[in-house]
Amino acid sequence: MKKILAVFAVFGGGGVLMSADIEDSTLKAIFENFEKSSKNDSIKAGLSPRQIELSNLAVIIASGSLRLWQERVEKSELKADEIMELLRQSTAYLGMARIREFIFVTSEIYKRKGVKITDFALESDENRLKNGQNLQIELFGLATTDSMKGELTQIGKYLSQNCFGDYYTRVEILSLIEREIITFFLLAAQGDTSAQMKAHAKAIFLQGLNKEKLIALINANIALIGYPRSLNATAAVIEASK
């Protein structure tokens, strides 16, 4: 007889309702065995456990799995500032509407543990724009910023100032290659992001992670993301490498 345990966790103000947890020992064994073996294969391919964990966490956020996120954060060896920085960056690709509860729950975890999160002052609009554009050029070349004209002028400015200027610039917490890995897997987990995945795959190549390693990193996420989106992400990587 299957044991069904309904767990409701309500946090003040936000009111997060945790879904019912259906205990299935067969599925649990299959999932854990496959995830472990795929991660081991990726490590053999030259990836670090840190790179794998960052990609896994990005997939979990983009998939909206709040419970799994809580479980992984509780066990994570990443620093609190690194976890929170990953969440902040995710806001640019998923939006605050999807990230808010993750931020709230994560903050509660670190409050309970007595861990303080570092706050950072907001740069001026001019500096954020300039620094963001410089990072875009480093990652994608001049063509990217030059292409944002006409109807795309305003969103192009926001991309430079907000998406890159507000988040990517804190490379002392997460490096550029780590941020690109996070972004790629935020995109991969959403689906219908082939063009964006190709662009960020090219940026990852420029940062020193080759096609084979990026595909191995995708394989380390199949258990979480599923086969269709893993195949789509792999196709984008292959196309970007041509």
Which stretches of residues belong to each language-model region?
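Conserved active-site and cofactor/substrate-binding residues in soluble primary-metabolism enzymes
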Residues: 50, 81-82, 177, 192, ...
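Classical Sec-dependent N-terminal signal peptides that target proteins to the secretory pathway
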Residues: 2-20
